[in-house]
């Protein structure tokens, strides 16, 4: 994909900042190029990404394109900030195509600064049902959806930040004994109904569970705080960072701040009154949270930091600073 075409695609996608909800016109050829080129980059990079801070971590977006643009507006557009997204870019929201196309375009333009993990919705069996297939078919063709599927089958599934913070979309697996197992997962691959890859994208923490429990989703497991503590101790890690669940404040701790859930789609589906969040990891592994708030159903948002307390994780290398700042409202 030549630089001129890539820049043109990005510029057109960013023009939507002025008109939230505007459909961006991209050609079928441009979308195919985004998929083919990014697919090659995903396969050249490892399935377990090894990244260095500073980096900003974002959770589910689900086709809420105006909210993705707001995240960049306040976190800094690439390459001014490094990003790691935890998956679930498509389905449910109105603009899955704009969302995934901008993310793939940034991946191509800044392959060493911009990283995308796979979520459970980056799977043909799921996004065939929950909106992405229909959006592709309505705006382009079923063939385009299949090309996206080939691209999604090559996405990495986990990341390790400075050997301390372990990131994935869903959660842990009873089969996960060594990070080498993730490196050894071969791509391209669909997401199986069970096993390590399935669990990394589907499992959930549960405060009422000790050990492993059944999952109400009908897929994978739930796991308790004891599983989190044991896993971190065994692999000498400090924090698990995942997405996959709507949380009211955009982020939510579990297991005495050894795990954090990040969800970046505020007012999810227009049905939840949740905030969205982004976690910033500084060079010294200080973690802070920026909040994109949903104030009402008409999508007025405020963006600021959350809290007013300083707390430390059990291991000294990773800290959480929840600094208090005045929130600013954005229409």
From Swiss-Prot:
Compartments where located: Nucleus; Cytoplasm
Gene3D superfamilies hit by this protein: 3.60.21.10
Domain of life: Eukaryota
Residues the record lists as binding Mn(2+) 2: 88, 120, 169, 244
SMART domains, sorted: PP2Ac
Catalytic reaction(s) noted: O-phospho-L-seryl-[protein] + H2O = L-seryl-[protein] + phosphate; O-phospho-L-threonyl-[protein] + H2O = L-threonyl-[protein] + phosphate
Entry-annotated residues carrying N-acetylmethionine: 1
Principal subcellular localization: nucleus
Keyword set includes 4Fe-4S: no
Name of the top EC class for this enzyme: hydrolase
Cofactors required: Mn(2+)
GO molecular function: metal ion binding; protein serine/threonine phosphatase activity
Enzyme Commission code: 3.1.3.16
Annotated residues for binding of Mn(2+) 1: 60, 62, 88
GO cellular component, one term: cytoplasm
PANTHER family per record: SERINE/THREONINE PROTEIN PHOSPHATASE (PTHR11668), SERINE_THREONINE-PROTEIN PHOSPHATASE PP1 ISOZYME 7 (PTHR11668:SF500)
Family, per entry: Belongs to the PPP phosphatase family. PP-1 subfamily.
Function: Serine/threonine-protein phosphatase that possesses phosphatase activity toward para-nitrophenyl phosphate (pNPP) in vitro.
Name by which UniProt lists this protein: Serine/threonine-protein phosphatase PP1 isozyme 7
Species this protein is from: Arabidopsis thaliana (Mouse-ear cress)
Organism placement in taxonomy: Eukaryota, Viridiplantae, Streptophyta, Embryophyta, Tracheophyta
């Amino acid at each position: 994909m030549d630089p001129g075409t890539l820049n043109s695609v990005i510029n057109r996608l960013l023009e939507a900042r002025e008109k939230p909800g505007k459909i961006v016109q991209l050609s079928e050829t441009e979308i195919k190029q985004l998929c083919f080129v990014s697919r090659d980059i995903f396969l050249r990079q490892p399935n377990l990404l090894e990244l260095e801070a500073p980096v900003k971590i974002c959770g589910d977006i689900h086709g809420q394109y105006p909210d993705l643009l707001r995240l960049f507006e306040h976190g800094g557009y690439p390459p001014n900030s490094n990003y790691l997204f935890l998956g679930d870019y498509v389905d449910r929201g109105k603009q899955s195509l704009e969302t995934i196309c901008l993310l793939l375009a940034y991946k191509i333009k800044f392959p060493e600064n911009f990283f995308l993990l796979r979520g459970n919705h980056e799977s043909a069996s799921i996004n065939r049902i929950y909106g992405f297939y229909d959006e592709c078919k309505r705006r382009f063709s079923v063939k385009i959806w299949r090309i996206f599927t080939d691209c999604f089958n090559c996405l990495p599934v986990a990341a390790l930040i400075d050997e301390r913070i372990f990131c994935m979309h869903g959660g842990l697996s009873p089969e996960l004994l060594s990070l080498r197992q993730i490196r050894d997962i071969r791509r391209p691959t669909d997401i199986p109904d069970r096993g390590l890859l399935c669990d990394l994208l589907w499992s959930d923490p549960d405060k009422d569970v000790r050990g492993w429990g059944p999952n109400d989703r009908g897929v994978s497991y739930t796991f308790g705080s004891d599983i989190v503590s044991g896993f971190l101790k065994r692999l000498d890690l400090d924090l698990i960072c995942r997405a996959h669940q709507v949380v009211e404040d955009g982020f939510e701790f579990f297991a005495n701040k050894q795990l954090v859930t990040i969800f970046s789609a505020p007012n999810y589906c227009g049905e939840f009154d949740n905030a969205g969040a982004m976690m910033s990891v500084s060079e010294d592994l200080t973690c802070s949270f920026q909040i994109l708030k949903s104030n009402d159903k008409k999508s007025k948002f405020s963006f600021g930091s959350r809290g007013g307390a300083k707390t430390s994780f059990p291991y000294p290398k990773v800290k959480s600073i929840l600094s208090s700042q005045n929130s600013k409202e954005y229409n």
